[in-house]
Structure formats: structure tokens, C-alpha cells
């Protein structure tokens, strides 16, 4: 009796290899999407922090620039508690009063040099986020803050 050889003997383990390749691609793509989502969340949080600091500077014109920086980083003028974002410090925050005390004065709060750190270093370990600046018009009724 003549026995016909099938190709199945030559394909042993191919399913396992295909599964390993597919899982590797899927897991890598999944972590890339998670990291991209975290980067977008940090982008939004930094933008909101700059807005929050500018709003505080306009509404509390008797406050110092350090209080504004604390509001940006900690969400509290006293600077107590944990920073709202990892790696964000008051050194990353700049507060500029332009013609403050006049009717057309402005307050600018900017966050610069923030390093976004990846949880899983697919691309690299850190990237520098762009600067976030918020400028609001202020009327201080003649009061000029101490740290101008």
C-alpha cells in the first residue's frame, strides 16, 4: 500500500510561531496607544494648569508669583500636597506681569521644559513637552504685586 505524505508534518509549530508574532505586534501596539493616551492627558493637564495659574493671578492680584506657581504645580497657593503631575515643579513655571496696575495690563503664566516620562520606553525614556502659555487681561485697581 502506498502511503501519501501530507504537508502537515512539515508545518508543525507554525501556529505557535504565528501566534507569538501576532501577540508581539498586538501588545506593542496596545502599549503604544496607552502611552500616546497618557501623553495627551498630560498635554491637557499642563494646559489646564497654566490656565488655572493665570486665573488665580488675575483674581488674587495681592498674591505673589510664588503663590501662582504653587497653584499651577500643587493646585493650592500654600504649595502643600503632591504635585498634580509627576516631574512638574515650580522651576518649570514662569509668571510675567505686563503693565499690571494699568487698565490694559496682562498676566502671563507659562510652563516650559516639562519632561514627559514614558512608563514603557518604546520610543525613548523622556520627551520634552512644548511650552504652555496662558495670558489673561487683568485690572488691579492700581495695585502692583510685590514680585513684579
Positions of PLM-derived features:
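Short, conserved structural patches
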Residues: 2-3, 51-148
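Alpha-helical assembly-interface signal, strongest on the long, hydrophobic N-terminal helix that forms
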Residues: 1-73
Amino acid at each position: 500500500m502506498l502511503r501519501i505524505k501530507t504537508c502537515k508534518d512539515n508545518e508543525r509549530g507554525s501556529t505557535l510561531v504565528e501566534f507569538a508574532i501576532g501577540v508581539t505586534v498586538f501588545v506593542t501596539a496596545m502599549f503604544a496607544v496607552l502611552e500616546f493616551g497618557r501623553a495627551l492627558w498630560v498635554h491637557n493637564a499642563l494646559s489646564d494648569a497654566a490656565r488655572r495659574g493665570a486665573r488665580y493671578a488675575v483674581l488674587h492680584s495681592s498674591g505673589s508669583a510664588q503663590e501662582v506657581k504653587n497653584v499651577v504645580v500643587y493646585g493650592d497657593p500654600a504649595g502643600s500636597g503632591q504635585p498634580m503631575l509627576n516631574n512638574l515643579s515650580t522651576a518649570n513655571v514662569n509668571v510675567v506681569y505686563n503693565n499690571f496696575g494699568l487698565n490694559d495690563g496682562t498676566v502671563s503664566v507659562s510652563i516650559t521644559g516639562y519632561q514627559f516620562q514614558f512608563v514603557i520606553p518604546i520610543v525613548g525614556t523622556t520627551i520634552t513637552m512644548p511650552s504652555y502659555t496662558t495670558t489673561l487681561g487683568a485690572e488691579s485697581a492700581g495695585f502692583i504685586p510685590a514680585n513684579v
